[in-house]
């Protein structure tokens, strides 16, 4: 189970984009797309049905989920995420380093 969710603030910990930060746009099985990182150029054909123009389009490619970590804004470092059950029985995501709850992505 991936502990990184859409909307999380992450930092890249390995690869050519190491040290850069961004917001998660999407999460699949073991890959994540991060806003503004791992940009690739795609040659796109024009499509009359959708109205898409042809040409060279720059877009985000996915990164492996093991190469990113959730960014803890209070410590300004990469952190791990765990789950904690509160007294009401609700599960909340917390940082492993300091036990603070992870901000809910909007």
Curated annotation (Swiss-Prot):
Residues annotated as signal peptide: none
GO biological process: translation
GO MF annotation list: rRNA binding; structural constituent of ribosome
Keywords: Ribonucleoprotein, Ribosomal protein, RNA-binding, rRNA-binding
UniProt cross-references to HAMAP family, sorted A to Z: Ribosomal_uL24_B
Chain's role: One of two assembly initiator proteins, it binds directly to the 5'-end of the 23S rRNA, where it nucleates assembly of the 50S subunit. One of the proteins that surrounds the polypeptide exit tunnel on the outside of the subunit.
Family under the similarity heading: Belongs to the universal ribosomal protein uL24 family.
Name used for this protein in its record: Large ribosomal subunit protein uL24
Originating species: Acinetobacter baylyi (strain ATCC 33305 / BD413 / ADP1)
């Amino acid at each position: 189970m991936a502990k990184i969710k859409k909307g999380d603030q992450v930092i890249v910990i390995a690869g050519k984009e190491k040290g850069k930060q961004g917001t998660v746009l999407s999460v699949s099985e073991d890959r994540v797309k991060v806003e503004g990182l791992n940009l690739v150029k795609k040659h796109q054909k024009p499509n009359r049905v959708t109205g898409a123009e042809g040409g060279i389009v720059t877009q985000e490619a996915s990164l492996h989920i093991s190469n990113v970590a959730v960014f803890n804004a209070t410590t300004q470092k990469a952190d791990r995420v765990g789950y904690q059950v509160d007294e009401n029985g609700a599960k909340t995501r917390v940082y492993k380093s300091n036990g603070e709850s992870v901000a809910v992505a909007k």
